[in-house]
């Protein structure tokens, strides 16, 4: 090896050693039914928004919802956990990012039901039915955290 190549090799080593892995977003664990297509689309929505998503297919979501504190009547087709919060249903990634940034004293967020046009429930016409993202307080209270659809 000549001097020039040796020098280039020595200069390259620190650069290679400094290379960083791409930044990864917050880890979200999604519990869903294996057969649910809209859940898969919501998972894709989160991944495209920069979240690291782990999916666990469940045969019974009831115990998961109960464990994390999803109130009766406020459920949907999948339950996620991120940063000490639950995320129930088709909550937009931007609202989850806001939750993690603001860190309110709460159990989590929910979009009850499956509103047309919410992430994972998009329709060909582009229609978005009005829906609310609800914040579930530690005491079980609910308040509107975000509103989507007409009149946003």
Can you say where each PLM-predicted feature lies in the sequence?
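Thiol/selenol-based redox catalytic cores and closely related redox-interacting motifs
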Residues: 67, 73-152
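Amphipathic alpha-helical interface surfaces
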Residues: 42, 60, 92-96
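Local sequence-structure signature of Cys/Sec-based thiol-disulfide redox active-site neighborhoods
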Residues: 26-41
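Processing junctions and N-termini across compartments
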Residues: 12, 30-33, 74
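A short beta-strand-turn-helix
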Residues: 21-23
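C-terminal motif of bacterial Sec signal peptides marking the signal peptidase cleavage site
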Residues: 16-17
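N-terminal secretory signal peptides and thylakoid transit peptides that target proteins
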Residues: 1-12
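N-terminal, post-signal-peptide region of Sec/Tat-exported proteins
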Residues: 43-82
């Amino acid at each position: 090896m000549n001097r020039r190549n040796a020098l280039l090799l020595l200069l390259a080593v620190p650069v290679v050693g400094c290379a960083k892995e791409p930044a990864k977003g917050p880890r979200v664990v999604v519990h869903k039914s294996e057969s649910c297509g809209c859940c898969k689309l919501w998972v894709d929505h989160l991944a495209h928004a920069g979240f690291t998503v782990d999916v666990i297919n469940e045969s019974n979501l009831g115990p998961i919802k109960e464990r994390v504190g999803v109130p009766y009547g406020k459920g949907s087709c999948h339950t996620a956990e991120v940063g000490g919060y639950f995320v129930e249903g088709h909550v937009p990634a931007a609202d989850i990012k806001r939750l993690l940034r603001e860190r309110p004293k709460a159990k989590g967020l929910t979009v009850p039901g499956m509103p047309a046009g919410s992430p994972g429930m998009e329709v060909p016409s582009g229609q978005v039915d009005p829906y609310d993202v609800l914040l579930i307080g530690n005491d079980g209270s609910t308040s509107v955290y975000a509103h989507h659809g007409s009149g946003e």
